[in-house]
Amino acid sequence: MGAIAAGIAMAGAAIGGGVGDGIVISKMLEGMARQPELSGQLRTNMFIGVGLVEAMPIIAFVVALMVMNK
């Protein structure tokens, strides 16, 4: 039962992380297309946003391991 719960948690986190990354990157590209002079600042903010979005699957992985070993 724990393995199924861990798999579902990881699947949800992976889907959420992928969608979140796609949204962050697409908005950054839209901003660069509108204001190319801000590309450096937008790129920096995009990397910070992607890092924050990717924290969720990592946390879900740790929780999934804890659920499996319980």
Curated annotation (Swiss-Prot):
HAMAP family: ATP_synth_c_bact (MF_01396). Keywords: ATP synthesis, Cell membrane, CF(0), Hydrogen ion transport, Ion transport, Lipid-binding, Membrane, Transmembrane, Transmembrane helix, Transport. The record marks E54 as: Reversibly protonated during proton transport. The gene is atpE. Belongs to the ATPase C chain family. Its main location: membrane. This is ATP synthase subunit c. PROSITE patterns: ATPASE_C. It is found in: Cell membrane. GO terms for cellular component: plasma membrane; proton-transporting ATP synthase complex; proton-transporting two-sector ATPase complex, proton-transporting domain. It comes from Levilactobacillus brevis (strain ATCC 367 / BCRC 12310 / CIP 105137 / JCM 1170 / LMG 11437 / NCIMB 947 / NCTC 947). GO terms for molecular function: lipid binding; proton-transporting ATP synthase activity, rotational mechanism. F(1)F(0) ATP synthase produces ATP from ADP in the presence of a proton or sodium gradient. F-type ATPases consist of two structural domains, F(1) containing the extramembraneous catalytic core and F(0) containing the membrane proton channel, linked together by a central stalk and a peripheral stalk. During catalysis, ATP synthesis in the catalytic domain of F(1) is coupled via a rotary mechanism of the central stalk subunits to proton translocation. F-type ATPases have 2 components, F(1) - the catalytic core - and F(0) - the membrane proton channel. F(1) has five subunits: alpha(3), beta(3), gamma(1), delta(1), epsilon(1). F(0) has three main subunits: a(1), b(2) and c(10-14). The alpha and beta chains form an alternating ring which encloses part of the gamma chain. F(1) is attached to F(0) by a central stalk formed by the gamma and epsilon chains, while a peripheral stalk is formed by the delta and b chains. The chain crosses the membrane at residues 4-24, 47-67.
